[in-house]
């Protein structure tokens, strides 16, 4: 054989594997096509699901929009109906008002604006009367409730727990306990005024009653510092002509007085018809003295044949505790020892007793320097017409040597001026050697602070009582 033929035969078996690679490629292409079809099917399913969800969302949104539109339509229709119903009513009221005003204007002859103004004033007056009546009724009701049962007291409120609910709404058991204990606490509060120790000795030979104010204790604190400046007034009821005062004890709630006062010319038969009064006051230089309490001892209830010494609780009083309301006066004192000059400045008076028929007075003030029952010097202020609270601010000077200042008395008298008849004294204050209580304290403060004016309020005393004191100076 030729060599070329041999090569052809050899080359044929080498070219036979080519058909085997063709079916593998076909398989790969088939797999790719299958995958693509699967992916396309999944994509179509996803698209269909998304389209379904979108359609459902669109339907829900359309339903919500329809509901909102229906509610808005109903609201607008209701508003339109209300406005349509309210407008005619308002128009009717306005029409009636115009007709009424025109009728009133025609009958009275006033302009329409005048009629409208009168109607408004009438409505305001009626409304004010109704408001005043309601407020007065509520005020009376509050006062009645305050005087009635006390369900919860301040102590129980303070003892409540830290929980806010307990503070706002306490338990019913606590309320009932407080209601039951209300009377006992009222009694305890009445006993917080303190008590007084005194001694009584009656002398049948001289027909005199010696009263000793020994001490007091557990007095209430009336000053800002938690203390008081107590003093005691002693007098007999019903005449009240003779009154005595103890010294003022500064900043104490348990003062010790140990002062004795004697009521002379008091027969035993007359003493049985009288009541001995101990009135305790808190001294205040610049305002009216506050009464702490009092002790009343009817002499017919005790045995005057023996010496009596006892403690008694103070009782609260309304008003002045038997003291006449003559008024108060404020004046200042200044003494210069080197020059022997006493200056009295009458500042003002207040709440004076009504002396005239019209319920007023024409007050002026007389100032007198007295020694041994004799009047050495006198001066007086101007007259203030028709007033119970006169203001003077008038200064007066007296020459009083230092050797004589301890022997004189300064008598300040408020007098009601009368053009026709005699002028009547309203009340009086006595300072100096015969002064007692607050008057003596004022005089002592003046001497202790030379060259400096000392101002103080004083309660006016009965002129008849002070006349007896001045007579005893002789």
From Swiss-Prot:
GO molecular function: calcium ion binding; calcium ion sensor activity; calcium-dependent phospholipid binding; phosphatidylserine binding; protein homodimerization activity; SNARE binding
Gene Ontology annotations of biological process type: calcium ion-regulated exocytosis of neurotransmitter; calcium-dependent activation of synaptic vesicle fusion; chemical synaptic transmission; clathrin-dependent synaptic vesicle endocytosis; larval locomotory behavior; liquid clearance, open tracheal system; membrane fusion; neurotransmitter secretion
Domain C2: 192-312, 325-458
Consequence of changing residue 367 to V: In RNA edited version
Main localization category: membrane
Note accompanying the cofactor annotation: Binds 3 Ca(2+) ions per subunit. The ions are bound to the C2 domains.
GO cellular component terms given for this protein: axon; dense core granule; exocytic vesicle; membrane; neuromuscular junction; plasma membrane; synaptic vesicle; synaptic vesicle membrane
Residues the entry annotates as binding Ca(2+) 1: 223, 229, 282-284
Keywords, comma-separated and alphabetical: Calcium, Cytoplasmic vesicle, Membrane, Metal-binding, Repeat, Synapse, Transmembrane, Transmembrane helix
Biased composition (Basic and acidic residues): 30-49
Cofactor: Ca(2+)
Compositional bias segments (type: Acidic residues): 171-187
Tagged with keyword Ribosomal protein: no
Location relative to the cell: Cytoplasmic vesicle, Secretory vesicle, Synaptic vesicle membrane; Synapse
Phospholipid binding: region residues: 186-434
Family: Belongs to the synaptotagmin family.
Subunit and interaction comment: Homodimer or homotrimer (Potential). Identified in a complex with Syn and nwk. Interacts with StnA and StnB via its second C2 domain. This interaction may mediate its retrieval from the plasma membrane, thereby facilitating the internalization of multiple synaptic vesicles from the plasma membrane.
Protein name, per record: Synaptotagmin 1
Lineage of producing organism: Eukaryota, Metazoa, Ecdysozoa, Arthropoda, Hexapoda
Gene field: Syt1
């Amino acid at each position: 054989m030729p060599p070329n033929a041999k090569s052809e035969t050899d080359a044929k078996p080498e070219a036979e594997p080519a058909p085997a690679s063709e079916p593998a490629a076909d398989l790969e292409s088939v797999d790719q096509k299958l995958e693509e079809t699967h992916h396309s099917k999944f994509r179509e399913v996803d698209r269909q699901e998304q389209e379904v969800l979108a359609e459902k969302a669109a339907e829900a949104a359309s339903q919500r929009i329809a509901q909102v539109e229906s509610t808005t339509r109903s609201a607008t229709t209701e508003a339109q109906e209300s406005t349509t119903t309210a407008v005619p009513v308002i128009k009717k009221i306005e029409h009636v008002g115009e007709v009424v005003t025109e009728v009133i204007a025609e009958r009275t002859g006033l302009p329409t604006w005048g009629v409208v103004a009168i109607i408004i004033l009438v409505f305001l007056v009626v409304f004010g009367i109704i408001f005043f009546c309601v407020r007065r009724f509520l005020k009376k009701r509050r006062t009645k409730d305050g005087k009635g049962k006390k369900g919860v007291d301040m102590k129980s409120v303070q003892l409540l727990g830290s929980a806010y609910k307990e503070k706002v709404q306490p338990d019913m058991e606590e309320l009932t306990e407080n209601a039951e204990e209300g009377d006992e606490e009222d009694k305890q509060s009445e006993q917080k005024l303190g008590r007084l120790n005194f001694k009584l000795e009656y002398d049948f030979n001289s027909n005199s009653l010696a009263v000793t104010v020994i001490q007091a204790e557990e007095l209430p604190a009336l000053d800002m510092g938690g203390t008081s400046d107590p003093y005691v007034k002693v007098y007999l009821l019903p005449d009240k002509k003779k009154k005595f005062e103890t010294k003022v004890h500064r900043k104490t709630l348990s003062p010790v007085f140990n002062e004795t006062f004697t009521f002379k010319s008091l027969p035993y038969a007359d003493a049985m018809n009288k009541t001995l009064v101990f009135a305790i006051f808190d001294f205040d230089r610049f305002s009216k003295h506050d009464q702490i309490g009092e002790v009343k001892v009817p002499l017919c209830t005790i045995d005057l044949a023996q010496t009596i010494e006892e403690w008694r609780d103070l009782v609260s009083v309304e008003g002045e505790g038997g003291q006449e309301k003559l008024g108060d006066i404020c004046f200042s004192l200044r003494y210069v020892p080197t020059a022997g000059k006493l200056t009295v400045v009458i500042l003002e008076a207040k709440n004076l007793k009504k002396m005239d028929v019209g319920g007023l007075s024409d007050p002026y003030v007389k100032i007198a320097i007295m020694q041994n029952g004799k009047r050495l010097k006198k001066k007086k202020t101007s007259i203030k017409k028709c007033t119970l609270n006169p203001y003077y601010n008038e200064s007066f000077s007296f020459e009083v040597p230092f050797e004589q200042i301890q022997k004189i008395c300064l008598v300040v008298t408020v007098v009601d001026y009368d053009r026709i008849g005699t002028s009547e004294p309203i009340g009086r204050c006595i300072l100096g050697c015969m002064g007692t209580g607050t008057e003596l304290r004022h005089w002592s403060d003046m001497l202790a602070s030379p060259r400096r004016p000392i101002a103080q309020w004083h309660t006016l005393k009965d002129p008849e009582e002070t006349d007896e004191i001045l007579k005893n100076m002789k």
